[in-house]
A protein has these predicted regions:
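Acidic metal-coordinating catalytic centers involved in nucleic-acid phosphodiester chemistry
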Residues: 1-12, 61-254
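Catalytic centers of nucleases
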Residues: 5-8, 12-13, 17-80
Length: 254
């Protein structure tokens, strides 16, 4: 891999990692009536009663976030895509895991001069006044921190006794779960995730129980010893005796 492609791969992974943590956080705080769709129309789409409520783009770049990072000139840009849902009166969000540039910050604060500059650029990219006004009215640009979001996820996990007993394992399962949803373009919600948590907890309890019993009621076959010869054991098995550890250890049950 050359230097340029290596840098690109690392940047892509950094972005995917931050996006996954953000989606995991949103899943943890969403009410039951909401469904989330990672990597669907946008990095994240949130629906309520099958109606789109939020379209979210997640950015993690090394420089201040600017309008150009959202590629407004492109026919398939973030802004063009969200305008397809204009009639649904949804929220559009840009989540930045880095500083927000001055121009976008001014739009976010609804500063008059900032909005004027934003409008001028968007008009030059062939957006209409109506479209630009709708974007300004519905957009929210928010700075997030990956470490802080992870802390908030752990806080949620530790408030629930069921998930607090193995918070690290549950967290890793959550991140893996969201990653797989993103790759497969599937949806989830609180009910589905809580069912998965119950399965994970059962597995953990089962493994823990086996670990505690190993060496007590559960013994390695090699630990079973007998004074009987292989010939005697073989004769027993041929005569119909139930297979015991000594028969199994000597491969007589095959």
């Amino acid at each position: 891999m050359n230097l340029k492609s290596d840098i690109g791969a690392r940047a892509a992974w950094k972005g995917f990692s931050s996006q996954t943590v953000y989606i995991a956080y949103r899943l943890m705080i969403l009410e039951d009536k909401f469904d989330i769709y990672p990597e669907n129309v946008e990095d994240l789409m949130i629906k309520k009663d099958n109606k789109v409520e939020e379209l979210i783009q997640v950015k993690n770049i090394s420089t201040d976030l600017t309008l150009s990072h959202l590629k407004p000139k492109d026919k398939d840009s973030f802004f063009r895509r969200v305008l397809d849902y204009k009639s649904e009166n949804l929220k559009i969000k840009v989540i930045s895991f880095g500083n927000i540039g001055f121009e976008l910050e001014q739009v976010n604060k609804r500063n008059e001069e900032g909005i004027k500059s934003f409008k001028k650029k968007m008009l030059s990219y062939d957006y209409t006044d109506e479209e630009i006004n709708w974007i300004i009215e519905h957009i929210e640009i928010k700075k997030e921190n990956e470490a802080s979001l992870k802390e908030k996820i752990f806080e949620k996990l530790n408030k629930n006794f069921k998930t607090s007993i193995a918070d690290n394992i549950i967290f890793n399962c959550l991140i893996n779960y969201i990653s797989n949803l993103s790759r497969k373009v599937e949806m989830t919600n609180n009910k589905i995730w809580n069912n998965k948590v119950n399965e994970i907890i059962k597995d953990i309890v089962s493994i823990k129980g086996m670990h505690e019993q190993y060496g007590r009621t559960i013994l390695n076959l090699s630990d079973y010893r007998t004074d009987k010869s292989v010939e005697v054991l073989s004769e027993e098995y041929r005569n119909g005796i139930d297979a015991k550890p000594d028969h199994i250890r000597n491969n007589l049950d095959i």
